From Swiss-Prot:
Cellular component per GO, a single term: cytosol
PANTHER family on file: DOUBLE-STRAND-BREAK REPAIR PROTEIN RAD21 HOMOLOG (PTHR12585:SF20), SCC1 / RAD21 FAMILY MEMBER (PTHR12585)
Residues with PTM Phosphoserine: 46, 153, 175, 249, 454, 544
Post-translational modification comment from the UniProt entry: Cleaved by separase/ESPL1 at the onset of anaphase; this cleavage is required for sister chromatid separation and cytokinesis. Cleaved by caspase-3/CASP3 or caspase-7/CASP7 at the beginning of apoptosis.
Region of interest (Interaction with NIPBL), residue spans: 154-171
Pfam family, one: Rad21_Rec8
Name of the protein in its database record: Double-strand-break repair protein rad21 homolog
GO biological process per UniProt: apoptotic process; cell division; chromatin looping; chromosome segregation; negative regulation of G2/M transition of mitotic cell cycle; negative regulation of mitotic metaphase/anaphase transition; positive regulation of sister chromatid cohesion; protein localization to chromatin
Domain comment, as recorded: The C-terminal part associates with the ATPase head of SMC1A, while the N-terminal part binds to the ATPase head of SMC3.
Amino acid sequence: MFYAHFVLSKRGPLAKIWLAAHWDKKLTKAHVFECNLESSVESIISPKVKMALRTSGHLLLGVVRIYHRKAKYLLADCNEAFIKIKMAFRPGVVDLPEENREAAYNAITLPEEFHDFDQPLPDLDDIDVAQQFSLNQSRVEEITMREEVGNISILQENDFGDFGMDDREIMREGSAFEDDDMLASTGASNLLLEPEQSTSNLNEKINHLEYEDQYKDDNFGEGNDGGILDDKLISNNDGGIFDDPPALSEAGVMLPEQPAHDDMDEDDNVSMGGPDSPDSVDPVEPMPTMTDQTTLVPNEEEAFALEPIDITVKETKAKRKRKLIVDSVKELDSKTIRAQLSDYSDIVTTLDLAPPTKKLMMWKETGGVEKLFSLPAQPLWNNRLLKLFTRCLTPLVPEDLRKRRKGGEADNLDEFLKEFENPEVPREDQQQQHQQRDVIDEPILEEPSRLQESMETSRTNLDESAMPPPPPQGVKRKAGQIDPEPMIPPQQAEQMEIPPVELPPEEPPNICQLIPELELLPEKEKEKEKEKEDDEEEEDEDASGGDQDQEERRWNKRTQQMLHGLQRALAKTGAESISLLELCRNTNRKQAAAKFYSFLVLKKQQAIELTQEEPYSDIIATPGPRFHII
């Protein structure tokens, strides 16, 4: 594209054109009218910078679209103007005359209504006040509690008067003070009055008897059936029914302020025909003045009182006083602020970056102990192959070895592991092998020339299978323990003279025996590993790339030694192929794995060709195209 970005940018000269070509809906009417098509077309035909043919074509398309929009808007405006002109000058429309061009005042003005504020109020009789108040008035039955009263004489009397006169008529018969039962009945008629008021009630009854004896035969009323008028209204000779009642003695009404000794004086002035009651003779204790005992009913025996209502005070939860908490420390000193600024442990975390390469990421995922001991070196996607691999990871210990291990018959752990690693060795010959090993280990110090070469194969079967410490260290350890002039018993001297022919050479000659380089390859590797460990201890600051280079160099040396050994073996024996099973005979697992890996590296470099007839069978190596070149 031969154009600069500023030409088609948002504020460029051709921005509207480019937008119209690609996003026509984004343009507004104002953008269309602001766009100058003449200058735009000139800038497209003769641009200041070079533009591609495709870009100029897009810009011309935008010009066409903007021109189309302008023509469309112009046509719409013309149509609207034409319609308005046509509606304004349509035929049949007559102009208004001069006098009708202005609207009437009443037609455009709202009428104003002024109310008469001097109007008299309506009459109160016209307003139904009772009906209005009855709406908010409840019935008595709804707002009043029902009173449950016991056996009262009000319901039993049908005569004139609201109160019964049973006790008073009994006193008129003159038998009121003959028995003490009258006092008990009088006290029983009152429900809530205390028994100490019996004396005052008796005095009141006596005063009523004296007052009513004057009107015993005035023939007013029905005799004993006297009512309230008999007691109150007709109580004076001079007054009529509607006159004010005469002033009664103070003994008629019990007042709380009146002391008790006044009643005692009135009791002494009264003389009755019958015997005096014991209450009137004995001195009466002064009764405490209580405002609650005041009553305005003339006859207290006929009055009743409601039972007290049990008022239970609701326990309100006491409001807890809100305690204002004020921070004692109002300012932070400079030491605290400096400590907070210097402490950045809460915002710093350990750096955990992902490995830079996929290979390192895979090593990190599968480099743990749990992965190394449960997964193969290569990823197996098939579950059946993975099961076949994991089945060999947990070998079963033979039953006799397990019993011997539990019974403590094995001398040490190394001996137990040797027996476990070499189950093909007959159990009957183990004692003889121990004796032979003792015979072999001791004369190595004195005659290492012939005896060591003859017994190397047997020591490989027993010692290297369990991965014991290297022979030079064992020799040094035994040399330190043995005296410079060892005393050899005669039995051991006889065993030393046994020729090596008596050892069981039942196995066929091995390739490692023909070529000592293949046999000494693991020992050389051990020595190199020791040297490498010493170098690693001295150089702890090497990078991971250097470690990988050292590992690759080590594998290259091991592969070179394996290749030279195979070349010499094929040259000496004249064979066309070498068996891996034959090569790994009498070696431990680590040595066999190293040889197998060397085979794979040589196969990758096309030095040898590997064939295998079936899974888990022997691998045959034949010379490859680069067998003699590398």
